[in-house]
Regions:
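Catalytic-core "active-site belt" of small-molecule-metabolizing enzymes
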Residues: 2-201, 238, 242, 252-260
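A conserved acidic, glycine/proline-rich C-terminal tail/linker
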Residues: 206-238
């Protein structure tokens, strides 16, 4: 790792520790995914903080062609993973930075012996639980999404937490694409879709993550959650707003944002 990557990582870690915004990118922006993951790995080393899972996001064309990947990943720290209870979950976000909410399926990893899964069908054997949920995306750097996938990767994949909702029965895993999903913010619907629009779906996202971790020398752990990708889109949200995701025939989950 070069010193510049370490300095960028340290700036993001410090900003996240202290809930401070960064008005500018703290260094030279990475121009390729390899450089971006070097920064992400340096941040993980700085934290020395338990990981509870990983978020997977989509890289759209033409950037996916230029970068050689159609997805990206980022760490989810264990202390930012919440389970739905009687009251609405509350998540801190960066006021003055970037914040968004995403309806997603959450997959719990159960690593197996042998080669990594190459297809979404094979990836099902590496998962022992699926839940509905919400990913909270937030960064101290407000232009993180505007600056593109490499910048997103360099700041923890733009993740700030996960909410785990109801379980999806194992008999339904083959038909996740048939489950209609909608997302509301403060009572207004902002998106509606299904995983049929998502590359090779949630299990394909898990397979991608496992390959990414292997390439980086990170061994997957049982119990890690995979936030498998935004179904209805990436919807910006502000402190005080409430998000509700509904998964037809499965249930709903909701969370309130608060200033960090």
């Amino acid at each position: 790792m070069n010193s510049a990557a370490g300095d960028i990582a340290a700036a993001f870690v410090n900003a996240r520790r202290n809930w401070k915004t960064l008005p500018e990118y703290p260094g030279e922006r990475p121009s390729d995914l390899r450089s971006a993951y070097v920064i992400q790995d340096a941040a993980l080393a700085d934290w020395n903080r338990p990981i509870g899972g990983w978020k997977v996001g989509k890289i759209n064309p033409p950037m996916s062609d230029e970068l050689g990947a159609n997805r990206l990943v980022g760490p989810v720290f264990a202390d930012t993973v919440q389970r739905e209870g009687q009251d609405s979950a509350q998540f801190p976000i960066f006021a003055g930075g970037f914040a968004a909410i995403e309806a997603e399926f959450m997959l719990r990893l159960a690593p197996q012996e042998g080669p990594l899964p190459a297809t979404r069908e094979a990836a099902m054997d590496w998962v022992d639980e699926v839940r509905i949920g919400l990913e909270v995306a937030s960064s101290p750097y407000a232009a993180i999404n505007v600056d593109g996938p490499c910048v997103t990767v360099s700041d923890h994949g733009n993740n700030a937490g996960l909410l785990l909702g109801a379980c999806v029965d194992r008999t339904e895993w083959e038909r996740l694409d048939d489950i209609a999903v909608s997302l509301q913010i403060d009572g207004r619907e902002v998106g509606r879709a299904s995983t049929a629009t998502m590359l090779d779906g949630p299990f394909g996202a898990a397979a991608f993550l496992l390959r990414n971790l292997s390439d980086r020398g990170i061994a997957p752990e049982a119990g890690w959650w995979v936030s498998s990708g935004a179904i209805t889109g990436v919807h910006e949200i502000a402190p005080g707003q409430r998000a509700i995701a509904r998964f037809a025939g499965v249930g709903q989950t909701e969370a309130v944002m608060q200033a960090g």
